[in-house]
Amino acid sequence: MEPAMHRANSAIAAGVMLAESDNLVRPLPGLLDGLSRADCNRLRAIGREKALEAGQLVWSQGDTQAGIYLISEGRIRSYYAAPSGREVTLAYWFPGNFVGGPDIFGTGPHMWTSVAAERSRLTFMPGPALRRLALESPTIAVALLDALAFKARCYSAMAQMLGTRSVTERLHSLLIFLSHVYGVKRGGEIVVGMPFTHGDLANLIGSTRQWVTVQLARLQEEGVIRYVISILDLSTLGQGME
């Protein structure tokens, strides 16, 4: 298990979520970053590796929590499913992140579903064992609290944007987020290297795939973007977002 844990520890992780704050539009240090070798070894001792193919569930909404899953490879999508069947994507999480909050010690029902968006490898850490480690090591406890605080800020920002921003503003904000975190400058363009479908973007902003397709086509006609997704004029997307 050590190689996978080492990769998660050494990587700079980032998620994808709906946010407009510059404090959230940045790579996120992995859960294990900053921990001593001894604390990393303690976490390795309680962990069990799990491999998932694309589309396989980590858990379903309503399942009883049993612990957290540290992502070693791949991409995990967390989403809420309404009784109507409509889904709202909360975030995509990458290596170095964990999924399984907010009840990380495993005593309540999961509030949303998490699924592998691509082939992924995770390390499962049982809640009771994780609680014991948090009581024994203040550094581990603080690392868990910091990660939970970041997730809380992400979900709070998402709720604020869904409630106060138009769907067009949310799309523009998401494109700005992707450009800041996953964009690579090539000449006068910013090329977003992460592959996301129109459906992925729609789920993140609370819209439909058809609407996103129409809006991206319009932005392309206006010379703001070029598929896939190359941002030509970042300032235009930011107009009116203050």
Predicted regions and their residues:
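Polybasic "coupling" helices that flank or enter modular domains
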Residues: 135-206
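Phosphate-/nucleic-acid-contacting segments
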Residues: 180-242
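A residue-level structural signature of the nucleotidyltransferase/glycosyltransferase Rossmann-like core
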Residues: 68, 90, 122-123, 193, ...
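Cyclic nucleotide-binding regulatory module and flanking cytosolic helices
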Residues: 2-54, 99, 103-105
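Cyclic-nucleotide recognition modules
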Residues: 39, 91-153, 157
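Cyclic nucleotide-binding regulatory domains
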Residues: 31, 56-119
